[in-house]
A protein has these predicted regions:
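Terminal targeting signals and extreme-terminal segments of soluble enzymes
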Residues: 1-296
Length: 296
């Protein structure tokens, strides 16, 4: 099990190193889980799913070096465990002069854990342009500092103190300010870093509207897991300060929730839009036989 002191040594630089997958043959890449660095912030021995999504984005960017990654859609089928490396196998569906598509299979110990469909293209000049304005919320200086240990990352929440607490009741929305140091200059790593946080607060956003339930109960009395993540990047993806992640849960029921969101710069530019589907269900009796640190 990782400890708070272990996680306090995790840095943004190390995270970017994890994202930077290495070639391992034609249309194949190897991604490291990072040991304790890769463990989820809840101390379970399960890698954050969006870490592998970020690695898939970098793999596709390396496969199509003359193009820019525009979107990624991931479907999670099983958890990636801390330890063994992950094999990223690219199925190039189409590769043209302006666009390309690849489906990335992420395998660990020979078993497929997730599939990521990635679209890349060559950006062109605008015919028309508009974007969703940044929400008018409290500035980072007036938001609540959140403890999510990582050297070089600051997280501040608007109108929420403890994102995991069942006592944090409010509308099904969350606004999170993020500051990274360093900010990568490589386009693929910048997009990977933006994508990484898109899955962290979706379930908390949904639970916020329901008294008596919070993500502190996840994997203990309630079963939760992200099932899909989609992200679209809006060129150019570059920033120099704080990022605002907006989350809105539009529906929950029948054991699944849906959250949509946006990533803006502090100046108001829209860098990305994202969506998450997540499982929220009673913990089955059979699940209690599995170590809580290893549950999906």
């Amino acid at each position: 099990m990782t400890t708070d002191s272990d996680q306090a040594q995790w840095s943004v630089g190390e995270l970017l190193d994890l994202f930077d997958v290495r070639p391992d043959g034609p249309d194949r890449f190897t991604a490291e889980t990072g040991g304790d660095v890769g463990a989820g912030q809840d101390q379970r021995q399960v890698v954050e799913g969006t870490q592998v999504v970020a690695q898939a984005i970098v793999a596709v960017a390396k496969r199509f070096p003359d193009k820019s990654v525009r979107s990624a859609h991931a479907v999670f089928s099983r958890a990636v465990a801390v330890g063994s490396s992950v094999e990223l196998v690219l199925d190039v569906v189409a590769e043209g002069r302006s666009t390309a598509t690849a489906i990335v299979a992420a395998l660990q110990n020979g078993r497929r854990c997730l599939s990521v469909t990635v679209l890349a293209d060559v950006p062109t000049g605008d015919v028309i342009r508009h974007h969703l304005p940044r929400p008018e919320v409290a500035a980072p200086a007036n938001a609540n500092v959140s403890e999510m240990p990582m050297i070089g990352r600051e997280l501040r929440l608007v109108d929420v103190v403890d994102v995991n607490s069942p006592d944090e009741i409010g509308p099904p929305e969350l606004y999170a300010w993020l500051h990274y140091d360093p900010i990568p200059t490589r386009d693929d790593l910048a997009k990977a870093l933006v994508a990484y946080f898109t899955g962290h607060l979706g379930i908390s956003t949904t639970m916020r509207a329901h008294p008596g339930i919070g993500t502190s109960q996840a994997h203990l009395t309630v079963s939760t897991a992200p099932m899909t993540i989609s992200i679209a990047f809006h060129e150019p993806v570059c920033w120099g300060g704080w990022l605002l992640y907006t989350h809105e849960s539009t529906q929950v029921g029948a054991g699944m929730s849906y959250v949509r969101g946006a990533v803006h710069t502090e100046e108001g530019e829209l860098l990305a839009s994202f969506a998450q589907e997540a499982l929220i269900r009673p913990l089955r009796t059979s699940d209690t036989a599995i170590d809580a640190r290893s549950r999906f």
